[in-house]
């Protein structure tokens, strides 16, 4: 069976499309969720390094990102040590440039994303099922927000930060994501729906925070490693911001978790 030129072009377009990268990210993430704890930790450390590197390059602090995985490990294994460590590292990088602005950037980069991503590990320690539910809920919100906003969106939510995101997309994403949480979390339908709404709203805030940084530094995406999805920071922003909130909710019903 011969493949026509048109079929080749169509196949090539799909491989570069948003849908292809979405499926690729989704399948890879599902495989990662079920990894043993030690391998899962390595993946989170890589994600921490990748996100920190993208944001560091965008902010012009190219040396700081090496230390972000170290901060994550320090907080995870010996949390009282993390804050003095962050302070010392921030002062070191500020001293090299002798700029207060550099101190604030360095401190931010050492906190972000390390002290957020560590909660993905903590969620998995409570239950792989909860981690699966959390990530699926974020995905459902993202997918419905994108397609509802694209097809029905008329009202910009925060046009100065992200003019393409709409009120309709936001409400649609949060509605369907919260319905998923309502059907899967063990807190009753109404409570689970409301908890899901709160978690997803925090995730949307993370998305806007990322957009704010991009607008400040004048870039469209933090990288193009995932094609139209952008970079690691663009793809996992909502997940990063909402992980601590979801973990705290899970802790409310568990006795074997710690902050």
From Swiss-Prot:
It holds the Pfam family CTP_transf_1. One of its GO terms (cellular component) is plasma membrane. Its EC number is 2.7.7.41. The chain crosses the membrane at residues 31-51, 69-89, 103-123, 129-149, 170-190, 193-213, 236-256. GO terms for biological process: CDP-diacylglycerol biosynthetic process. It is a multi-pass membrane protein. PROSITE patterns: CDS (PS01315). It catalyses: a 1,2-diacyl-sn-glycero-3-phosphate + CTP + H(+) = a CDP-1,2-diacyl-sn-glycerol + diphosphate. The keyword Glycosyltransferase does not apply. Its main location: membrane. The keyword RNA-binding does not apply. Keywords: Cell membrane, Lipid biosynthesis, Lipid metabolism, Membrane, Nucleotidyltransferase, Phospholipid biosynthesis, Phospholipid metabolism, Transferase, Transmembrane, Transmembrane helix. One of its GO terms (molecular function) is phosphatidate cytidylyltransferase activity. It is found in: Cell membrane. Pathway: Phospholipid metabolism; CDP-diacylglycerol biosynthesis; CDP-diacylglycerol from sn-glycerol 3-phosphate: step 3/3. It comes from the Bacteria. Belongs to the CDS family. This is Phosphatidate cytidylyltransferase. It comes from Aquifex aeolicus (strain VF5). The gene is cdsA.
């Amino acid at each position: 069976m011969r493949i026509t030129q048109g079929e080749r072009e169509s196949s090539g377009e799909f491989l570069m499309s948003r849908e292809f990268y979405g499926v690729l990210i989704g399948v890879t993430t599902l495989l990662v969720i079920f990894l043993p704890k030690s391998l899962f930790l390595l993946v989170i450390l890589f994600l921490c390094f990748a996100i920190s590197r993208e944001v560091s390059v965008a902010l012009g602090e190219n040396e700081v990102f090496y230390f972000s995985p170290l901060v994550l490990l320090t907080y995870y294994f010996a949390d009282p040590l993390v804050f003095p460590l962050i302070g010392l590292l921030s002062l070191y990088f500020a001293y090299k440039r002798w700029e207060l602005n550099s101190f604030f950037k360095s401190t931010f980069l050492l906190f972000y994303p390390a002290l957020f991503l560590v909660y993905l590990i903590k969620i998995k320690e409570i239950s792989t099922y909860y981690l699966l539910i959390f990530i699926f809920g974020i995905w459902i919100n993202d997918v419905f927000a994108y397609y509802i906003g694209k097809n029905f969106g008329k009202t910009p939510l925060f046009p100065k930060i992200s003019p393409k995101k709409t009120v309709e997309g936001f409400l649609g994403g949060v509605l369907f994501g919260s319905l998923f949480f309502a059907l899967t979390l063990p807190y009753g339908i109404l409570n689970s729906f409301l908890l899901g709404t709160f978690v997803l709203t925090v995730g949307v805030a993370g998305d806007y925070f990322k957009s704010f940084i991009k607008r400040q530094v004048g870039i469209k995406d933090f990288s193009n490693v995932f094609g139209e999805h952008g970079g690691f920071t663009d793809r996992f922003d909502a997940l990063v911001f909402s992980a601590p909130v979801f973990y705290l909710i899970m802790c409310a019903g568990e006795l074997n978790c710690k902050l």
